[in-house]
Amino acid sequence: MILTLFSTIIRRRWFLVCLASILVIITLNSCSPSEFKTKAAQVSQIVFISPSDPDTFNSPQSESLFSRIVFGLLYDGLINENGVTAELEPALAESWEISDDKRRITFTLREGLKWSDGEPFTADDIVFTYNEIYLNEKVPTGVRDILRIGTSGAFPSVKKLDERRVEFTVPEPFAPFLRYVGGITILPKHILQESVRTTDANGNLKFLSTWGTDTDPEKIIGNGPYRMVNYTPSQRIIFRRNPYYWRKDTQGNSQPYIERIVVQIIENPDNQLLRFRTGEIDSLEVAPEMFGLMKREEKRGKYKIYNGGPASDTRFISFNLNKARNHKGEPFVDPIKSRWFNTLAFRQAVAYAIDRETMKNNIYRGLGELQHSPVAVPSPYYLSPQEGLKTYSYDPEKAKQLLLDAGFKYDSQGQLLDWDGNRVRFTLLVKAEEKTRVDATVQIQQDLKRLGIQADLQVLNFNVIVQKLQSRNWDAYVGGFGGGGVEPHSGFNIWYSQGSLHQFNQGPQPGEPKITGWEPSDWELEIDRLFEAGVKELDDRKRKEIYGRFQQIVAEQVPFFHLVNPLSLEAVRDRIENIQFTALGGAFWNLYELKVQPD
């Protein structure tokens, strides 16, 4: 689950996305420049793409989505999530046991595990990583947020049982804990312990300045399938196979099979497409507007466009429901508009007024599905329309009737007026960086105009949008969140009424000026209770019922009206074998199994 709208969600959820597989993040695209093909004719390799340089090689401190490409190659988790089935599978841990009271998980490591420098990987590394890094208040890391258990926010405890066994204890049953803790990066104690226990001249832990991007890449030690050997900023990162990696196939051959990975840093999407069409790139995410061209060239270009079905991302329109006032006593939202937005019939009318079928066919070129829920379709907790989820088919007449029944009215020019004669007009935000989203927002503007509503479109830079949302200074916006995998609790900070990403009714946040008059609605508090119940319930059937009720509330109350979910499409060269493409895992979740045939 994977670009996101907000930078904070990257801090809080990058490690969750990695749970889909240590390598799911490589689905960002890939390329193979001719200079590397020439120099490495005898070396099997794939060249991936990153649109940006990594911000650091110190994974707990990274806030960059694209740094995950590096970490996915350098590290394995204790367990992996299968990119096809979403089932949890052994990785560094060969097995795990859960106590009868569901509060203790004991992991048993594989025998003979080693770091990429040949040193043993043991339970000491796990205990060190958790106790001295992730749970260390002096180390700023978003990982610590996801380790908070239940409503108390208490942390798990971890202790070594012997060289190969480690035990985690949680203060109360917490259903997602195994999936969360099993995928978090473990760091080498023998390399980093001194930096965590000593400070620099300014009194800061030396760890905070350790493994920056100016570090010799060969000094970055991992436990994953590859080791980093070269980094040229704004150009490329080169990885070689880790000779100490633990995986072997059924014949006893070492994995991964591919010797070298090159990550080319190419920011411009047009340049990425150009390089793919000239044969220099091995893989490319296929946007709807480029599908026709790429499909026509599929055979000549010797690639296949894989279709994983609907992506796990969400796209929606949302209104600002916040009734609070800032520290000066001024309302965040114009009270006149706030009354509209907080009228359920208004939100439902907007939902009926948006022609999503036309949006899917014209803007997404038919390469998408209507989206009805914040939970990804591949998730076992997804509630489908066939199972009773409320949906909104395009029905402008029903939309008008809902508004009239709620006390709205029309003037002689067909403009919608509220109870007091105010024209219904508001600002609709969308980020400029995604053409498809802008086009969809223009259509929404036109659909609402036919309903008598004037939506003034503002196409703004991503960072400006973030600032407006965080300051509560907005009316409505078209946005989206990256996929959180199959676990609904990964959206906790979006849906919990006091969550940091509860943008449609943002409560008080740490470090900001005092706000007054904020209150969550009854249905928001009900969602709080459902999320609290969902993480304590360990029976999957009952969890599905709990999260089904959550999805039904969202559908009925429409804090987000979900739009079109594009298909997960990726073009991959035919010479790369053993691809098992899914929307959940992408093309390269099983990179260790892939083979490359000579051109």
Predicted regions and their residues:
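A structural "hinge/loop" feature
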Residues: 52-69, 92, 119, 142, ...
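Glycine-rich and polybasic anion-binding loops at the starts of cofactor/ligand-binding domains
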Residues: 563
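Surface-exposed binding/hinge segments that line
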Residues: 108, 145-203, 232
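Acidic glycine-/aspartate-rich tracts in secreted/extracellular proteins
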Residues: 53-54, 112-113, 173-174
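N-terminal lobe/hinge region of extracytoplasmic solute-binding protein
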Residues: 49-100, 131, 138, 221
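General beta-strand recognition
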Residues: 47, 89, 104-106, 165-167, ...
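Extracytoplasmic/periplasmic ligand-capture domains
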Residues: 30-38, 84, 97, 103, ...
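Short, low-complexity disordered leader/linker segments with a strong preference
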Residues: 1-44, 157, 412, 416, ...
